[in-house]
Swiss-Prot record:
GO terms for cellular component: cytoplasm. Gene3D superfamilies: 1.10.287.400, Argininosuccinate synthetase, chain A, domain 2, HUPs. This is Argininosuccinate synthase. The gene is argG. One of its GO terms (biological process) is urea cycle. Its EC number is 6.3.4.5. It catalyses: L-citrulline + L-aspartate + ATP = 2-(N(omega)-L-arginino)succinate + AMP + diphosphate + H(+). GO terms for molecular function: argininosuccinate synthase activity; ATP binding; protein homodimerization activity. L-citrulline binds at residues 99, 135, 139, 192, 201, 203, 280. Homotetramer. L-aspartate binds at residues 131, 135-136.
Length: 444
């Protein structure tokens, strides 16, 4: 039997990741009418645009679900988000502005926790709203089978019968109204939004055009910092880490990481911090474009990176950054719990994050405009007296530097000889306009 089912398995339990929106509501009721036994599973990911989670399972029962559960995923989501922060698992940047992989982190948590809940209920068929062109279909496929090797996957949006009957939002709305649910289709936006406590993703529709900019987006986690009528006062904020864990904001300690991140979101959101516009490569190697929000993670990341650069040596930082980019790509591909990802992640958490203790004061202004005002840590290896231009007791003398220059640069002769070889074989063209005019025609 194939893992992916192309038609509805009638008479069997089918779990659906149920958001309460039009698509999953119509799909659930349609499956019920067609003879399946639908079960609804809703992930509480702290979505900033959802204000009544408890009502969602009730609606699922109303639409025909044989069972409905609300799974609180917030603690696990924040734990994985902080792990990504500690390991720098972010590979998508544009001109130094970072996408914090908030959707891939959310999928790792949702895909494992919902399927685990389904397994408890004896539900071994899973459906969700991901389409065949996106990343999520592969992420959910991997995470679902990782948790339940007996899992079968049924997606209404891959079932031609469902598509023929309910292929669009207008058809779904009419279907629900005819069923007596008086479902009012929400106003169509110029883009689609997916969010969790870590961040929000805006993409598709009008945002598919690169002629449409960030200004068409209405932020849900912060302010539209580009608007002249939005008043934003500069604000100083302190962030404290202990052994790699964020523990305090503005001197207020948080025992619950979820509450700390919510407060970080509020602080960063007041300034529009952490918004970015990215062109990225999807898993299938086609490019897509997204506009992202992550005010809290952006705030924590500024402080964390500052401490990393002040505490660790150059080679450690280089490994942290290189491994972080590799890990970010694995996370994006739905491989956050694969052995190669665990190896990279735990290396960073053990050897980089554990030394990160200290406090950073930051002045936030508009958008991603900020300044670091102070950096304190008992673990700093930054010691200005080593390089002071003033007359102070030095850790090394001019004679020491002469010896270092001599020993460190013995290869200059070798380099000069190699450049001559390259010139002789035509790889370099010496001359007045050359980057290396000084080697032209020189003989040994």
């Amino acid at each position: 039997m194939s893992t992916i089912l192309e038609s509805l398995p009638t008479g069997q339990k089918v779990g659906i990741a149920f958001s309460g929106g039009l698509d999953t509501s119509a799909a659930l009721h349609w499956m019920k009418l067609k003879g399946a036994v639908p079960y609804a599973y809703t992930a509480n990911l702290g979505q900033p645009d959802e204000d009544d989670y408890d009502a969602i399972p009730k609606r699922a029962i109303e639409y025909g679900a044989a069972g409905a559960r609300l799974i609180d995923c917030r603690a696990q989501l924040v734990a994985e988000g902080i792990a990504a922060l500690q390991s720098g698992a972010f590979h998508i940047t544009t001109a130094g502005v970072t996408y914090f992989n908030t959707t891939p982190i959310g999928r790792a948590v949702t895909g494992t926790m919902l399927v685990a809940a389904m397994k408890e209920d004896g539900v071994n068929i899973w459906g969700d709203g991901s389409t065949y062109k996106g990343n999520d279909i592969e992420r959910f496929y991997r995470y679902g089978l990782l948790v339940n090797p007996d899992l079968k996957i049924y997606k209404p949006w891959l079932d031609q019968t469902f598509i023929d009957e309910l292929g669009g939002r207008a058809e779904m709305s009419e279907f629900m109204n005819q069923a007596g649910f008086a479902y009012k289709m929400s106003a169509e936006k110029a883009y689609s939004t997916d969010s969790n406590l870590l961040g929000a993703t805006h993409e598709a529709k009008d945002l598919e055009s690169l002629e449409s900019g960030i200004k068409i987006v209405n932020p849900i986690m912060g302010v539209a910092f580009w608007r002249d009528d939005v008043k934003i006062a500069a604000e100083e904020v302190t962030v404290r880490f202990e052994a790699g864990q964020p523990v305090a904001l503005n001197g207020v300690e948080f025992s619950d990481p979820v509450e700390l991140l919510l407060e970080a979101n509020r602080i960063g959101g007041r300034h529009g911090l952490g918004m970015s516009d990215q062109i990225e490569n999807r898993i299938i190697e086609a490019k897509s474009r997204g506009i992202y929000e992550a005010p809290g993670l952006a705030l924590l990341y500024i402080a964390y990176e500052r401490l990393v650069t002040g505490i660790h040596n150059e080679d450690t930082i280089e490994q942290y950054r290189e491994n972080g980019r590799r890990l970010g790509r694995l996370l994006y591909q739905g491989r956050w719990f694969d052995p190669q990802a665990i190896m990279l992640r735990e290396t960073a958490q053990r050897w980089v994050a554990r030394a990160i203790t200290g406090e950073v004061k930051i002045e936030l202004r508009r958008g991603n405009d900020y300044s670091i005002l102070s950096t304190k840590s008992p673990n700093l290896t930054y010691q200005p007296e080593r390089l002071s231009m003033e007359k102070v007791a030095s850790t090394f003398s001019p004679r020491d530097r002469i010896g270092q220059l001599t020993m460190r640069n013995l290869d200059i002769t070798d380099t000069r000889d190699k450049l001559r070889v390259y010139s002789q074989v035509g790889l370099l063209t010496p001359g007045e306009t050359s980057a290396l005019p000084q080697i032209k025609g020189d003989d040994k």
